[in-house]
């Protein structure tokens, strides 16, 4: 069975592993998932990620990040633009997550960017997800 929304699957696996206090989560690899993981790492939501060769295809291993007393660094993840309802934003109307405390992941012509990077670059695009 083919997966209709691999980004939603990626976010759901992260959300479930985070709520179960797992140290890492393994999922099927794709370039867009690796780019999202890179954004999450640069924003401090995950500690690291790596690509491994599996028996069939590649897999992406994401190491989750917790505080000193095991408090979660990811409070929430939400998929915004879905295959059935695409959501786009202009550079002048980019969303702010929790008043700037969270991050919106935007797919632009310059690649995947955060809402702050897209505003600085003056580009808009498809709003993929919110992370806070």
From Swiss-Prot:
NCBIfam families named among the record's database cross-references: PRK00136.1
Q: Which gene encodes it?
A: rpsH
Question: Function, please?
Answer: One of the primary rRNA binding proteins, it binds directly to 16S rRNA central domain where it helps coordinate assembly of the platform of the 30S subunit.
Q: Could you state one GO biological process linked to this protein?
A: translation
What does the sequence similarity comment in the record state about its family?
Answer: Belongs to the universal ribosomal protein uS8 family.
Q: Which GO terms describe its molecular function?
A: rRNA binding; structural constituent of ribosome
Question: Carries keyword RNA-binding?
Answer: yes
Note the HAMAP family from the entry: Ribosomal_uS8_B
Native organism is Mycobacterium sp. (strain KMS)
Alphabetically ordered keywords of this record: Ribonucleoprotein, Ribosomal protein, RNA-binding, rRNA-binding
* GO annotation, cellular component aspect: ribonucleoprotein complex; ribosome
Q: Which domain of life is it from?
A: Bacteria
Full protein name:
Small ribosomal subunit protein uS8
Subunit comment = Part of the 30S ribosomal subunit. Contacts proteins S5 and S12.
PANTHER family linked: 40S RIBOSOMAL PROTEIN S15A
């Amino acid at each position: 069975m083919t997966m209709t929304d691999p980004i939603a699957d990626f976010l759901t696996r992260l959300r479930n592993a985070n709520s179960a206090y797992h140290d890492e989560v393994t999922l099927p690899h794709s370039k867009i998932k690796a780019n999202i993981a890179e954004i999450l790492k640069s924003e401090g939501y995950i500690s690291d990620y790596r690509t491994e060769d599996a028996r069939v295809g590649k897999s992406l291993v994401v190491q989750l990040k917790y505080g000193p007393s095991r408090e979660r660094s990811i409070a929430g993840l939400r998929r915004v633009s879905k295959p059935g309802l695409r959501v786009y934003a202009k550079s002048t109307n980019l969303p702010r997550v929790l008043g700037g405390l969270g991050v919106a992941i935007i797919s632009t012509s310059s690649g995947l960017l955060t809402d702050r990077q897209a505003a600085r670059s003056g580009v808009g695009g498809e709003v993929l997800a919110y992370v806070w």
